[in-house]
């Protein structure tokens, strides 16, 4: 029986970097709980900020938090009011000194989490699920993605029996490690119940530079021996 592997965790250390960078011995559990608390605060306070990713790095008593947002202006606010309010909320929740950095996402259509949240929002607005899925897939492919897969599960269309609907466009090599695949999960809270939305976006292959250097070294050795 097959088991599904998380696309990000499957490629961690190969072509994906850690989103929490710190080391702890006995304080590992406490740091992990603090990270979960920080992520929940960001998710709760930055609803309209379109945050695609949160990176956490610890150095001493300071926590460096980097938010990747498609709407950085909303997160910053007029005169930086929203940033200061968010920073104070994070510091009160964790008890650590927070260094907050906000970076802009150039193409929100290529961020799987933002696409999933967009589809979930449209489902909550009673947009037909097939139309929402196809339009999201079309916009993502127009930006330059090589493949996309969207899966919705729940009482789609108000039916009494839950079912699964899937939309695929382009390629989706889930078994290839060098494939740059982004994954996002969102939930739509409708009158008929909860609908889960999963999105996979294939952005191309990431070829490590080590292979190129090894290939050039082999060619140089062959030329020297000749």
Predicted regions span which residues?
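RNA-contacting regions in translation and RNA-metabolism proteins
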Residues: 1-226
């Amino acid at each position: 029986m097959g088991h599904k592997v998380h696309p990000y965790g499957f490629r961690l250390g190969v072509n994906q970097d850690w989103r929490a960078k710190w080391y702890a011995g006995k304080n590992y559990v406490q740091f992990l709980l603090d990270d979960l608390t920080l992520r929940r605060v960001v998710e709760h306070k930055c609803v309209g900020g379109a945050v695609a990713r949160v990176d956490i790095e610890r150095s001493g008593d300071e926590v460096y938090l980097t938010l990747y947002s498609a709407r950085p202006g909303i997160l910053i606010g007029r005169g930086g009011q929203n940033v200061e309010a968010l920073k104070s909320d994070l510091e009160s929740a964790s008890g650590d000194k927070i260094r907050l950095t906000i970076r802009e996402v150039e193409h929100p259509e290529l961020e799987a989490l933002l696409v999933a949240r967009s589809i979930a929002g449209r489902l909550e607005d009673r947009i037909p699920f097939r139309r929402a899925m196809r339009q999201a897939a079309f916009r993502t492919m127009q930006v330059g993605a090589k493949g996309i897969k969207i899966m919705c599960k729940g009482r789609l269309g108000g039916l009494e029996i839950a079912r699964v609907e899937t939309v695929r466009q382009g390629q989706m090599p889930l078994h290839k490690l060098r494939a740059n695949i982004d994954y996002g999960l969102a939930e739509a809270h409708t009158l008929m119940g909860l609908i889960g939305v999963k999105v996979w976006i294939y952005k191309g292959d990431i070829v490590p530079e080590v292979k190129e250097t090894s290939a050039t070294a082999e060619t140089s050795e062959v030329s020297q021996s000749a």
